[in-house]
């Protein structure tokens, strides 16, 4: 159980760091840890003068491996959750959307991978 608790703490810390990083870049955090019956979205943010971003945060030993760690099944689950999130917020739907990954690695600045995959709904 300790490993799971430690992983949960690392995940929350990574999400907090990613949210701070986004705010410093001018993004507005709309939601954290959005849970739907389709899945969970780590962060939802509004890009400055841009789309709504659904962001998966990955804490890894190396930032490079994080973007590759979100497989097609997880992408589909996040896309379904994003669809449900936007369905209840039509004012956000008009902005467009994209799917991003933020990689968190020890002793390094976060790496923001924009528009990593596409989804239609």
Regions found by a protein language model. Name each.
Residues 1-32:
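Acidic-basic catalytic patches of nuclease active cores, encompassing PD-(D/E)XK
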Residues 22, 41-45, 49-66, 78:
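Conserved catalytic cores of phosphodiester-cleaving nucleases, focusing on short active-site segments
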Residues 24, 47-49, 92-93, 121:
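Positively charged, solvent-exposed patches that mediate nucleic-acid binding
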Residues 32-35, 100-102:
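Short, solvent-exposed loop/turn elements at beta->coil junctions and helix N-caps
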Residues 37-40, 107:
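Short acidic/glycine-enriched loop/turn segments that link adjacent beta-strands
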Residues 39, 51-53, 100, 111:
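Protein kinase-like catalytic core scaffold
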Residues 63-93:
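Mid-chain, well-packed structural core segment of small domains
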Residues 89-121:
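Domain-level recognition of nuclease-like catalytic cores that cleave nucleotide substrates
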């Amino acid at each position: 159980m300790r490993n799971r608790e430690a992983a949960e703490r690392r995940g929350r810390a990574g999400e907090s760091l990613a949210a701070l990083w986004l705010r410093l870049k001018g993004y507005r955090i709309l939601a954290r840890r959005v849970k739907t019956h389709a899945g969970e979205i780590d962060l939802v943010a509004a890009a400055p003068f841009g789309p709504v971003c659904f962001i998966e945060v990955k804490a890894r030993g190396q930032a490079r491996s994080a973007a590759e760690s979100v497989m097609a099944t997880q992408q589909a689950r996040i896309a379904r959750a994003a669809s449900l999130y936007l369905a209840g917020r039509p004012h956000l739907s008009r902005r467009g959307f994209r799917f991003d990954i933020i990689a968190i690695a020890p002793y390094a600045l976060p790496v923001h991978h924009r528009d990593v995959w596409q989804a239609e709904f």
